[in-house]
A protein has these predicted regions:
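Short beta-strand segments in beta-sandwich/barrel cores
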Residues: 36, 46-47, 64-68, 82
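A short, N-terminal "cap"/entry segment at the start of jelly-roll beta-barrel domains
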Residues: 1-40
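Short, ordered coil/turn segments that flank beta-strands lining enzyme active or ligand-binding pockets
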Residues: 9-10, 61, 70
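A short hydrophobic beta-strand segment most commonly corresponding to one strand
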Residues: 84-88, 98-112
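Conserved short histidine dyad/triad with adjacent acidic residue
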Residues: 21-24, 34-52, 75, 87-90, ...
Length: 112
């Protein structure tokens, strides 16, 4: 299980931060208000630069996803991996569905 946080830095760009499971366990108990969503996308999908719609964590349940930040760095996520999305401002990130299987993920709002 890989846990990666994306956040907006002082430079208004999105950055990656690897989290250990214990750090994620602390965040995961702070569920915020709003709906838990199941997101489905085709195997080959693309969403240009955008910000996270809210502080949330995204659990990949099937398929593969790639996230790219402004400096060109990319990370790939497979089932069981978690993306903690907190880049609410700035340039944001790109997401891609990769591989041959449709992508399904679970988005859970984070509280403060």
């Amino acid at each position: 299980m890989k846990v990666v946080r994306i956040y907006t830095g002082a430079d208004h760009q999105t950055h990656f931060q690897d989290l250990d499971v214990e750090a994620f366990a602390t965040l995961a108990t702070k569920v915020g208000e709003g709906a838990v969503r199941v997101n489905q996308g085709p195997a080959k999908s693309f969403s240009d630069f955008h910000n996270a719609p809210r502080r949330q964590y995204v659990v990949i349940t099937s398929g593969m996803m790639e996230v790219e930040i402004a400096d060109g760095t990319k990370r790939q996520f497979v089932p069981g991996d978690v993306l903690v999305a907190e880049d609410l401002t700035g340039k944001g990130h790109i997401t891609r569905g990769i591989g041959d299987d449709p992508r399904v993920s679970l988005s859970v709002p984070l509280g403060e």
